[in-house]
Curated annotation (Swiss-Prot):
InterPro entries: DNA-bd_dom_put_sf, MerR-type_HTH_dom, MerR_fam, ZntR. The lineage of its organism: Bacteria, Pseudomonadati, Pseudomonadota, Gammaproteobacteria, Enterobacterales. Zn(2+) binds at C114, C115, H119, C124. Keywords: DNA-binding, Metal-binding, Transcription, Transcription regulation, Zinc. One of its GO terms (molecular function) is DNA-binding transcription activator activity. The gene is zntR. This is HTH-type transcriptional regulator ZntR. Residues 4-23 bind DNA.
Length: 141
């Protein structure tokens, strides 16, 4: 059995993170010492690592709750359910990547249009393009 600080250290999170997951009903603490300290098991450590890894992959708390539910009661769930949750997250990531690539292209056009000299920025193409909403990036300074 582990106290909250020990569990936090092993899972590389803070005790406040564990308390937060408890409030979100993603972690439970059924055992306490006579002094009122929470005690956790190896199973709690595995659950906490599961949650932490899912958070690192960007899953929402709701998705993690669903995945935990599937993990806790695998006999009443299918792999298709887990895969559906992962596919949804994958689509979100792909959309974000496309958005970032579009942003990168826009920034590259702004960068390429500017001569970057030490002259006054009175006629800076970057500033002009940003003012116009980047609708027409002109070359020059």
């Amino acid at each position: 059995m582990y106290r909250i600080g020990e569990l936090a250290k092993m899972a590389e999170v803070t005790p406040d993170t564990i308390r937060y997951y408890e409030k979100q009903q993603m972690m439970e603490h059924e055992v306490r010492t006579e002094g009122g300290f929470r005690l956790y098991t190896e199973s709690d450590l595995q659950r906490l690592k599961f949650i932490r890894h899912a958070r690192q992959l960007g899953f929402s708390l709701e998705s993690i709750r669903e995945l935990l539910s599937i993990r806790i009661d695998p006999e009443h769930h299918t792999c298709q359910e887990s895969k559906g949750i992962v596919q949804e997250r994958l689509q979100e990531v792909e959309a974000r990547i496309a958005e970032l690539q579009s942003m990168q292209r826009s920034l590259q056009r702004l960068n390429d249009a500017c001569c970057g000299t030490a002259h006054s920025s009175v006629y800076c193409s970057i500033l002009e393009a940003l003012e116009q909403g980047a609708s027409g990036v002109k070359s020059g300074c």
